[in-house]
Structure formats: C-alpha cells, structure tokens
UniProtKB/Swiss-Prot annotation:
Disulfide bonds: none annotated. InterPro entries: WD40/YVTN_repeat-like_dom_sf, WD40_repeat_dom_sf. It is found in: Nucleus. GO terms for cellular component: nucleus. Keywords: Chromatin regulator, Nucleus, Repeat, WD repeat. WD repeats lie at residues 7-49, 51-88, 101-141, 269-314. The keyword Nucleus applies. The keyword Repeat applies. This is ASTRA-associated protein 1. One of its GO terms (biological process) is chromatin organization.
Length: 399
C-alpha cells in the first residue's frame, strides 16, 4: 500500500535509496533548508539527521559513504549509520547526528550535482563544476584520512573547442556547450550533461579521454541523468519528449583520433540514440525492474515499459493525495490555478528476490521481506511530503 513520509517543513530537493539489501529498507532525503534525514522505511520514521547551511542539491552513495552536495557551496562526506539500521526510530527531539568525515568547497551556483569515484582504498576523485565558471569542470583527488590532502588535478577544463570541431556546422550551431547540468558515474565513465543538450563521457586513465559524445538532446538542456541497468545505458532527459540513450564503445582506440593539450578523443562519433515518450519537460528519470519512470514539470509521474513504448500507469499528487491513473495524458504544463503539487525529487527501489533480514523481531522480518517483493517509486514534493508507491504492473507488461 502507498504511504507518506512527513517530517520536512519545506520542499524536498533530493532523495536517495540506500542500496544494500542487508540493511533495513532505507531512504535518505534532503530539503530546501539543508536538512538531511535517514529514514527507516519499515517504521516510516527518521532515525538519523544532519543539517547543512543550504539547500541539498544531490546525494550519492559510495560504499558506506553518503556524498551530500548543498547550496552552501560545500560537498560533505558522511558516514552511513550501519550500527542502527534495524532501529525503529527515535523521538523527534533526539535524532542523532550523522558523522561528518570530510568536506570540500564546490560551486553550486547552477544547481549542478557532483560525482565522486574511489581510486583506491583511501583515495577518491571528485568531478564538479569549476569554482568560478560553471561551463568548465574541475577534477580533484583526496585522501579520506587527511583533511588537507585535497589536490586539484584539472582546473577549468573546457570541452567546447574539441566538441565544436567534431560536429557538422550545417546541422548543429552553438557557440558554447553551456552550463554543466549533471554528472553521473557508470562503469568507470563520468558522464556530463550540458545546457546545450550534449552528453559527454570522460575517463581519466593516463590522461583525460573523451570516450563518448552524444547530441541526442540537442538543442534542449539536459535536465537529468540516470543509469539504466536493465538497458546497460545511461539515460538523459530534457525539456522535450526525447530521452537520450548513451552507450560508449569502450574498445575504441585513440591513436587515429583527435587530441588537444587537455584531452584525447577516443571516439569522435557524434551519437544520437534516443527514444520518444508521450510527455515532455522530464525533470526526473529512473529505470528500475524493466520499468522506465519519468516525472515531469506538470506534476505527473508516468510509468512505462523499459522501451518507453507502453504506458502502464501514472502517479499524481493532488490536494494531499496520490492518484494512480492508467491514463498519463494530461496537461503538458502546470497552470497557475492547478491543484497539482510540484515534484522536486524522485528515486526508485528495486525488488530483491532473495532477502535475509538481519533482525530478531519476526514482525519486522515479515515486513522487511514483504517490502522488497515490490518495486517502489518515492517522490519528494514541494510541500515537504514524500510519497512511496508500488509500481509493479507485471500483468500489464507485454513482451
């Protein structure tokens, strides 16, 4: 059954499902005021908190670390509270604080997220917007054990000159890539989504390599990037009704391709694979359990089959309720007098076929197993609520 999480007093701006089936089903949420909450989804209560000085922009899970980027121009690395994952929650007045173990100043003027990858046991690499120019990127490395180890290895890296020399000027005309909108890591490649609609894949191995270029969303801005594990692709959304599908050719050699003083281009092909769906202005996109889930500026979330061809259902919050409707075709935009509530964050939780709950309570064990038998979509709204809805429609999916 759908349920609602209520604790935030302002708009929810970021959600992250803690992806570890050995832990109690857990959600991490952040809001406009900088509050971070760790939720037990069985008890439906928060059991840890942390407060930043600005709006939460994004979360990333990296092993047992929570990477939180906020509008106070700071990236914080917090320790996930693994010792208390089976607790039922604490009274509101006594929520314990998450442990802060590292923080880095970053540029969050344009609401772009960040991406952190692990280099070895204690060393990490950060990809983010340049501290002064959001159209260029910085790359840092640091040792998590040493608060003074932060070192910038690439500064104000611009990709425009290289990309503009590869495109056909008769079909694509642009004088810049624009602001960096999104970062995401998949299979060792860092994908950047730009205001111009380009998605570029980078890899740092004995120099910086461009391994993938796509104009699928050109000339509209990239609004979101997500990993489509069932597809083996990265998916991008934009203001139009096209989703970009991104798969680099990792076996491409660089010796016959383009290079500059900053980067080597391993694959100079401009890719444009995409799929069209019957909604536009897709601000949030997720792919889970052979489902494609898209949330639009209209306040409607639509569930598709994995290829985006068949509409299975839609989710809409109106006047404090969530309406589930098999017809997704509504207004393309949100009128001023609309009673729909704006979607401000989304994440999904996949099914787990085999779950071995680490708890002693038989009741908790049953709820744990039952929860993971469903696919869940969790949506954060501008009114501070978080709605959790099952999105398993196996009986409607055709081969």
């Amino acid at each position: 059954m759908p349920f609602t999480l209520r604790y935030h007093t302002c708009g929810v701006t970021s959600l992250l499902h803690w992806n570890d089936e050995q832990d109690v089903p857990t959600l991490i949420s952040g809001d406009e005021k900088g509050s971070i909450l760790v939720w037990n989804l069985l008890s439906r209560k928060p059991y840890y908190k942390y407060t930043c000085r600005g709006q939460i922009v994004s979360f990333q899970q990296l092993n047992d670390l929570i990477i939180a980027t906020s509008k106070d121009h700071t990236l914080r690395i917090l320790k996930f509270p693994s010792t208390l994952t089976t607790k039922e929650g604490f009274p509101d007045y006594s929520l314990p604080e998450l442990e802060l173990i590292y923080e880095i100043p970053v540029n969050t003027l344009n609401f772009a997220n960040t991406a952190v990858e692990q280099v070895d046991t204690n060393n990490y690499r950060l990809w983010c917007c340049n501290t002064q120019d959001s159209e260029t990127i910085d790359i840092y490395e640091f040792d998590l054990r040493d608060s003074k180890s932060l070192k910038r290895i690439h500064r104000a890296l611009s990709l425009y000159e290289v990309i503009s020399g590869l495109v056909d000027p008769s079909t694509m005309k642009f004088d810049k890539l624009g602001t960096t909108m999104k970062f995401i890591i998949y299979e060792g490649i860092i994908y950047l989504g730009f205001e111009s609609g380009f998605v570029i894949g980078l890899r740092l191995t004995q120099g910086l390599h461009i391994v993938y270029i796509s104009s699928a969303n050109y000339p509209e801005p990239v609004l979101d990037l997500t990993v489509g594990k069932d597809l083996g692709k990265v998916i991008s959304s934009s203001t139009n009704s096209s989703l970009g599908l991104h798969t680099p050719n990792i076996n491409t050699e660089s010796h016959n391709n383009v290079s500059s003083k900053d980067v080597v281009v391993d694959d100079s092909t401009i890719h444009s694979e995409m799929v069209n769906i019957p909604i536009n202005k897709v601000s949030h996109i997720q792919q889970v359990d052979n489902l494609l889930i898209a949330a639009s500026w209209s306040g409607r979330t639509v569930v598709f089959d994995i290829n985006g061809n068949k509409v299975l259902a839609s989710i809409l919050k109106e006047r404090g309720q969530v309406l589930i409707d098999d017809n997704p075709y509504g207004n393309a935009s949100l009128p001023e007098n609309s009673t729909k509530v704006k979607i401000s964050a989304m994440t999904c939780i996949p099914k787990f076929n085999t779950v071995n709950p680490s708890c002693t309570s038989e009741g908790t064990r049953r709820r744990w197993i039952r929860f993971y038998k469903e696919t869940w979509c969790l949506i954060g709204y501008a009114d501070g609520s978080i709605k959790a809805t099952e999105v398993t429609f196996d009986n409607l999916i055709t081969a």
